[in-house]
Amino acid sequence: MARKRANAAVLAQDHLGIKRFFALDEAAYRDGPLPGRIKELLGLAASLVLRCDDCVDYHLIQCVEAGWSEAEIVDALNVGLVVGGSIVIPHLRHAVKTLGELRQGGDSTST
């Protein structure tokens, strides 16, 4: 919910470039030659490599909602770890903690 409010505040700035980027981001995760649910796994791995915990949280929520199993999500996190190296380990810890909370039905991510 906090993410939606924050995005609304950003979009309220009424800047064409920002609006276009947000539209591009949304469109990138829609079904295309690759299904949207696979794109969420890609987004998760990329977010881990980029060390963006907010992004990791968002993509974890999307992956859980898309029906990916914990093993499949952890496999995607492994790809992010291999690509990103040891510097992403703190973010991997965060991701595993968040995934556990999501699986228990809680949402401490405030997204």
Regions found by a protein language model. Name each.
Residues 1-40, 88-111:
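Acidic, glycine/proline-rich low-complexity segments that act as flexible tails and inter-domain linkers
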